[in-house]
């Protein structure tokens, strides 16, 4: 079986632009949640979010391209550029037909839809942008990355709500394993902090309403959690066949060893209460990686800060790991970033790889009130030095989609 390693990483997040800044903030337990500034949220139940601060797309992308991209694509392009640059991919030692792209989004160009709908109503159909459709479709980021670099290998997108990033990376991993590509650029990107997007989540009663103290709002596994905090960002990695990476002396961050996925088949938004869906995906990922539960040293939990999700995921971890569940550090970086929806998997895999590299587990901040039904070691409030050889990263999405990755220190 062909082995697959990570040779590049790129991240745009509410706690830092670029891997270096993200890493520093991650281990310091930096809060990235604040009042919404993208629009006036004064009439909303939830008025807080994990926004990417001071993001100016014109600093990174040509002006003409910026005007033809939704924000979710802009974020994804910047993350991909960092990942490709750090992987040191050059034209000289790579056939573009062997390089593919799989970068997904859970929502796509929602901001563009809202803007163009307003133009339609106010000025008529003739004034709607001819770039509306390519700006809103979820596969456009994959396409634009390929166009920019000339990568002509496998190219598509995945959209499985909050499991999108993990599904994208997992499928890219399998594409390389079976020999359909040598290198895949994979991950997720999202920018859904828009009037309509936030209104929809508010109507579902899914979001935290801790508006007066936004820095305390995202509190996974805490007894006082009251919903997730919407965020935005992008996480993109470069996956590469091991021998190919070694041949060109590429930097190696870690090895992807397992991928598992499943479907709750239960409810459109709520996870099944006993966690059997994510449990099935975790077991499949371990089986795929040929790893026993006792070998896992860290779990980057989905941990959304919602009453249902955190309880179900905790139960699933107990079912999979038995007594070992109480000995494994389990943390949710959403406590710092908020919930990045389709970008979550990519950003959290990067967090897991940084934990492997540095031997430091990022904390779950705002963990103050233990919940009897969430009683694992959630690495409360402060990062911890831990020898990590194998890590697991969980993602769960609306619709009951579950995707789990297992990564190994290289």
Model-inferred region functions:
Residues 76-89, 146-190, 228-250, 339-361, ...:
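Active-site-proximal alpha-helical scaffold in enzymes
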Residues 1-65, 87, 243-253, 350-364, ...:
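ACP-dependent fatty acid/polyketide chain-elongation machinery
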Residues 122-129, 170, 174, 191-247, ...:
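Glycine-/small-residue-rich "gating" segment that lines the acyl/pantetheine channel
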Residues 3-7, 34, 212-289, 298:
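Condensing-enzyme catalytic core mediating Claisen C-C bond formation in acyl metabolism
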Residues 8, 26, 80, 101, ...:
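Conserved small-residue
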Residues 34-78, 108-171, 180, 203-229, ...:
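Conserved catalytic cysteine-centered active-site region
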Residues 76-87, 141, 168, 240-242, ...:
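Short, well-ordered amphipathic alpha-helical segments that serve as non-catalytic structural scaffolds
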Residues 180-226, 259-273, 303-310, 327-377:
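Acyl-CoA/ACP chain-elongation machinery
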